[in-house]
Amino acid sequence: MSAIQVAPVTLASDDVLVACHRLIPQLSSSSNPITLDELQDIVKSDATVLFAARSGQEIVGLLALAIFRIPTGVRAWIEDVVVDESARGKGVGEALNRAALSEAGRRGAKTVDLTSRPSRVAANRLYQRLGFKQRDTNVYRYDL
């Protein structure tokens, strides 16, 4: 595998869309495929940075970083971290997370939050190694 290069996606191109269609089902089998218009909305939004990890020309990982201001400060949240099954264990997830943490800090966030299912043992181990701490909180979701 070539050296991993991580960069924000700045153009909603066909290769990024194809990568989303290939990678997102590896994260969530219940998610609907993203459309080119939806990808364009993500890329154009000031509140979202979509990072792509490439090995050569192939996109082998994605991470979405949401950054937003609320009355108590700038918040950052990592979502939809996925590394292709063929590239796991090769530093792709770490490279994506480090890029997101750097961008969040550059934009003024003091903390970055994420959630991860307990069954994702390797991912949880990575987050802890990177310095994430498990919070004593409840996470709630309201389905609309």
Cite the ranges covered by each PLM segment.
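Acetyl-CoA-dependent GNAT
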Residues: A3-V74, E79, N97-R98, E103, ...
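Conserved active-site alpha-helix within GNAT-family acetyltransferase domains
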Residues: E94, P118-D136, R141-Y142
